[in-house]
Amino acid sequence: MPCPCGSGCKCASQATKGSCNCGSDCKCGGDKKSACGCSE
């Protein structure tokens, strides 16, 4: 399931409900976390 953080975003640990946190759980394809919509 795609991350709600944004496109190009991958969940490090997918929850059973298929949701992820836009934090350390959010990994971007690039080096910019803002690309995933992460605040950090």
Curated annotation (Swiss-Prot):
Q: Which domain of life is it from?
A: Eukaryota
Q: Does the keyword Ligase apply?
A: no
Q: List the disulfide bonds.
A: none
InterPro entries per the UniProt record, alphabetical = Metalthion_5 (IPR000966)
For this UniProt entry, the molecular function terms from Gene Ontology, in alphabetical order, are: metal ion binding
**Record keyword Amino-acid biosynthesis present:** no
> Which biological process, per GO, is one annotated for this protein?
cellular detoxification of metal ion
One Pfam family per UniProt: Metallothio_5
Q: Name the UniProt key words of this record, in alphabetical order.
A: Cadmium, Copper, Mercury, Metal-binding, Zinc
Explain what induces or represses this protein's expression: Strongly induced by cadmium, copper and mercury.
Q: What is the protein's known function? A: This protein binds cations of several transition elements. It is thought to be involved in detoxification processes.
Q: Which family does it belong to?
A: Belongs to the metallothionein superfamily. Type 5 family.
The entry's free-text remark on domains says: All cysteine residues are arranged in C-X-C groups. These are thought to be the metal-binding sites in other metallothioneins.
What's this protein's name?
Metallothionein-1
| Gene name of the encoded protein | MtnA
